[in-house]
Amino acid sequence: MQKTTLLHEGKAKKVFLTGDSDLVIQEFKDDATAFNNKKKGTIADKGVVNNAISCKLFTMLESHGVKTHLVEKLSERDMLCRRLDIIKVEVVVRNIAAGSLVKRYGFAEGTVLDKPIVEFYLKDDDLDDPLMNESHAVALGVATLEELSVLRDRAEAINVVLKEFFAQRKLKLVDFKLEFGRYHNEILLGDEISPDTCRFWDLDTNEKMDKDRFRFDLGGVEDAYGEVQRRVLEQD
């Protein structure tokens, strides 16, 4: 399968059309951004690492009955995907208080939540991806109540699977972002699952092993991404 026209370029990936109108190729870049594009940089081989991790996790989730956009891994940086009509809702699942949850509500960082929190954000860079509820999403026309219910249920189910998977690899899944899209009357999981979209802390030391190392200039970014990749793929 070959790339044809560039369909979309985002902060971390490019999406290309192919000869099949139902399929696209997602190419992972090394570009890194934070704080809604206010901080920019590069993480060496990030695209290679995130593609490998995402392909592994999508395949694992498929084995648990979660339908995703992954068709196959084409190369180190390229993933063949079903072409989705992306729902403009970012779904964030939080297991441990960190990031904006701490800033917005005053949780102490590291507080283990009694029950995971599921949040919806409007996928709109110009508006800085604002937090929204179901009523906002429906009023904006980005999703129906029925679709939002599916997104919430799917995100909670994915969280159960991912938490167990990462715990077996000595990683705490602090929180993560998911994106979904419509595909022939189905809703599929899209985008990626990687240290760009998840917060991972080492199970024993609570060392941050994700994009927070880039956000807050903690150093060792490439090493952290590589270590997550090693643990995710260690049983392959």
UniProtKB/Swiss-Prot annotation:
Keywords: ATP-binding, Ligase, Nucleotide-binding, Purine biosynthesis. The keyword Hydrolase does not apply. GO terms for molecular function: ATP binding; phosphoribosylaminoimidazolesuccinocarboxamide synthase activity. Pathway: Purine metabolism; IMP biosynthesis via de novo pathway; 5-amino-1-(5-phospho-D-ribosyl)imidazole-4-carboxamide from 5-amino-1-(5-phospho-D-ribosyl)imidazole-4-carboxylate: step 1/2. Its EC number is 6.3.2.6. It catalyses: 5-amino-1-(5-phospho-D-ribosyl)imidazole-4-carboxylate + L-aspartate + ATP = (2S)-2-[5-amino-1-(5-phospho-beta-D-ribosyl)imidazole-4-carboxamido]succinate + ADP + phosphate + 2 H(+). The keyword ATP-binding applies. One of its GO terms (biological process) is 'de novo' IMP biosynthetic process. HAMAP family: SAICAR_synth. Belongs to the SAICAR synthetase family. This is Phosphoribosylaminoimidazole-succinocarboxamide synthase. It comes from Chlorobium limicola (strain DSM 245 / NBRC 103803 / 6330).
